[in-house]
Amino acid sequence: LKEKHRGKGGTIIAGMLQAKGDYALFMDMDQATPISEVEKFLPKFSTKGGSASGRKQGYDVVIASRSGRQGAPIVRKLMAYGFMFLRSLILRLPYKDTQCGFKAFKKDSVKEIFKRLKIFNESNIVSGASVSAGFDLEILYIARKLGLKIAEVNVNWYHKDTERINPIKDSLEGLRDLLRVRINAILGKYK
């Protein structure tokens, strides 16, 4: 993959669209979720056999869920719970954790989702080390709108200290992104 530096969003999009395997995974560089956690994801994609409950899996998208967010500061936890409430109210996304940077996709799902991105796409790249909450929201909203099967899997996650968190700025950006995805949906831009 040869790309000029275009920030986290641009790098993930380019990598996902050029992925060659049957599945594509993106994860945060700090490895707060260890790569070994992907072992929990793979059975979710399988259409053979079934789970312990006897149901076939066959998911198109598998996302990580940081249950309890052990080690995260209280401010981060409060921000997460507020965001969960607004997310379910505005976008009706039923997932516990949309923001964990550990997500995997079946190959055919990648192109269907990533070619429909409107806020974060090839022509609207946000530069810098991180992207706002809208990146993951838009991906999951599109996947759900397309009727793709999405599984959420509890993973081991370790809080990594960062100075990049600004509770007020990040909360306002998150709300802005929620509204942008909702407006795009109302305008029919995710068809």
Name every feature range the model reports, one short phrase each.
Residues 3-6, 10-18, 23, 35-129, ...:
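Acceptor/aglycone-binding surface of glycosyltransferases and processive sugar-polymer synthases
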Residues 31-33:
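Acidic metal-phosphate-binding loop of nucleotide-sugar-dependent transferases
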